[in-house]
Amino acid sequence: MKDVQNERDYRGIYLRKVGIKNIHWPIKIITKSGEYQSTVANIDISVDLREDLRGTHMSRFVEVLNGIDFLHPENLGKILQEVREKLKADSSHIKITFPYFIFKKTPVSQIASPNMIECVIEAELSKKLYMIIGVKVPIHTLCPCSKEISEYGAHNQRAIAEIYIKSKKLIWFEDLVEIAERSASAPIYSLLKRPDEKYITETAYNNPKFVEDVVRDIVSELEKEPKISWYRVEVTSFESIHNHNAFACVEKGWIKK
């Protein structure tokens, strides 16, 4: 059959990324404990395209995905190399977003329940392998200003802490989640009995944090790891008494002007 994708193109325009996106795919993730967790990922995968080629072979991306037994940051290089070879490209790229469940025990009743974290792995292979891993962690914040000016109580709410890093050594998703939760007013749990709810409410009240505080506390912990060469941290608070969200963010390498 005629291979239309391999026809010559004479417009002389190089394409940075060509591929498929928003494909949902069942995958297995290796956890920090060495076990496997099954989940469903949303995947974007692509290659570059030479200026003299009309198109790429889209089905080959799915063929590569079909051969993945499990996913781990340390085997992404092999996957991207296979993509590059199959598509005869100079660079290959992948972005994988998936729900990941971490079981936590409630602070008082000690009942384990799963908490969902959104995880991201984004990687590119050209001359070198570049990789970013990230998490979106639900947390609890309590407003220091509200506590200070009120005779009793303070407004508090759920928030999301986003942490993205480049690291020269493996940093587990669980490690990033722990950093986010330690930096919050209190963690979030799927299940809370009354003694747990009391404990969390009082913990948050005794540990008030602005979104600015949470971001700075997260960054302070990331800076302790010399193998982390880049990070981006953003915290968004779903304000309970305002008709807007509050956020703060920072990226390593930003220059103050």
Curated annotation (Swiss-Prot):
This is GTP cyclohydrolase FolE2. It comes from the Bacteria. GO terms for biological process: tetrahydrofolate biosynthetic process. The keyword Oxidoreductase does not apply. One of its GO terms (molecular function) is GTP cyclohydrolase I activity. Its EC number is 3.5.4.16. NCBIfam families: PRK13674.1-1. It catalyses: GTP + H2O = 7,8-dihydroneopterin 3'-triphosphate + formate + H(+). Keywords: Hydrolase. InterPro entries: GTP_cyclohydrolase_FolE2, GTP_cyclohydrolase_FolE2/MptA. Pfam families: GCHY-1 (PF02649). Pathway: Cofactor biosynthesis; 7,8-dihydroneopterin triphosphate biosynthesis; 7,8-dihydroneopterin triphosphate from GTP: step 1/1. HAMAP family: GTP_cyclohydrol_B. It is an enzyme of class 3 (hydrolase). Belongs to the GTP cyclohydrolase IV family. The record marks 143 as: May be catalytically important. Converts GTP to 7,8-dihydroneopterin triphosphate.
